[in-house]
């Protein structure tokens, strides 16, 4: 029969193991839910790999929108320094057009083309997603008003 002290020690050890496993599973779930934002220049400097789900923001390059062999829409996102090829098989937003700011979310295929699952276009002529504006500012091509991007002057658009 196990003495009282040994039984308490076994209970504490089992509780610690359960806690470590729970924290580990929680961190794994959180990591799979996180989507990092990149500019085309950041991707050129440090490619995130083909397994990573990412967001890329920038401007749709003029005269880059076309149809891929698969029937998907193919276009290029630029920050005026580097470019990222994108393919998207869904319906594009009504405000999607060349020269317009976009944020796409997806994964890179083995051929280096970003396979987008979602495409978000800016919703009016004054809004620029803060991540996109910051990436353009860092690339030295920000053409917006003032030092900080705003969501159409409404303070916080969330």
UniProtKB/Swiss-Prot annotation:
Transmembrane segments: 9-29
Primary localization class, coarse: membrane
SUPFAM superfamilies assigned: Heme chaperone CcmE
GO biological process: cytochrome complex assembly
Topological relation to the membrane, as annotated: Single-pass type II membrane protein
Ranges per topology, Periplasmic: 30-158
Binding site for heme: 123, 127
Chain's role: Heme chaperone required for the biogenesis of c-type cytochromes. Transiently binds heme delivered by CcmC and transfers the heme to apo-cytochromes in a process facilitated by CcmF and CcmH.
Name of the molecule in the record: Cytochrome c-type biogenesis protein CcmE
Organism in which the protein naturally occurs: Maricaulis maris (strain MCS10)
Lineage, highest ranks first: Bacteria, Pseudomonadati, Pseudomonadota, Alphaproteobacteria, Maricaulales
Originating gene: ccmE
């Amino acid at each position: 029969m196990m003495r009282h002290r040994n039984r308490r020690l076994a209970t504490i050890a089992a509780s610690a193991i359960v806690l470590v496993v729970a924290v580990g599973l929680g961190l794994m779930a959180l990591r799979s839910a996180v989507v990092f934002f990149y500019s085309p220049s950041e991707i050129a400097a440090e490619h995130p790999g083909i397994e990573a789900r990412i967001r890329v923001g920038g401007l749709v390059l003029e005269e880059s929108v076309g149809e891929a062999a698969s029937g998907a829409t193919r276009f290029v996102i630029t920050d005026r320094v580097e470019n990222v090829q994108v393919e998207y098989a869904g319906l594009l937003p009504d405000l999607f057009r060349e020269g317009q700011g976009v944020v796409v979310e997806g994964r890179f295929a083995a051929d280096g083309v970003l396979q987008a699952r979602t495409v978000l276009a800016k919703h009016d002529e004054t809004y620029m997603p803060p991540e996109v504006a910051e990436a353009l500012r860092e690339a030295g091509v920000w053409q917006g008003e003032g030092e900080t991007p705003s969501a159409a002057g409404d303070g916080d658009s969330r």
